[in-house]
Amino acid sequence: MAETNSRRRVAVLGGNRIPFARSDGAYANASNQDMFTAALDGLIDRFNLKGEKLDMVIGGAVLKHSRDFNLMRECALGTSLSPYTTAFDLQQACGTGLQSAIAAADGIAAGRYEVAAAGGVDTASDAPIALGNDLRQVLLGLRRAKSNVDRLKLVGKLPAAVGVEIPVNSEARTGMSMG
């Protein structure tokens, strides 16, 4: 018995991007959200999509702050698209934008979406600098402490625990960078 292909054909109708810039240059004070929203705004203007509901906005970033937990949804809400436009994040080292486009195309081919936008964004200018694990443990301990004496004991550990953990662009198992 012959197998029929029920997947729909997919077409990329256009795109938009903001210019590349060196870290700590033109976008030194811009976040991932600022930059992706700007690119999405340009797409909306270019294709007259103001007020339109897209079936999905897919994208993401590799260097993300904890505040970026719902990055694509916040980006979509920051534009003039319909607030009913759905969005989700994904993340793949050196391939977030491409993986987003593949996910959008797959959703269209499978009939889950009619129209989708996809992309990726990253900035090293606004790198997510995290607290060191020792400081994090002291701060969490302060929150859980049952008495002032327990809190004072933990406060005494603060000077030794203060430290900044700067993220590195390397793979955890090999220590090598992909870019």
What kind of region is each of these model predictions?
Residues G15-F20:
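Short polar catalytic/cofactor-binding loops
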Residues L13-G14, Q91:
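Residue-level detector of conserved, well-ordered beta-strand and adjacent loop positions
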Residues A61-R67:
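Glycine-rich phosphate-binding loops at beta-strand->alpha-helix junctions
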Residues A2-R8, R22-G51, D68-F69, A76-L77, ...:
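Acyl-thioester C-C bond-transforming condensing/cleaving domain
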Residues K53-G60, A117:
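Short glycine-rich phosphate-binding loop at a beta-alpha junction
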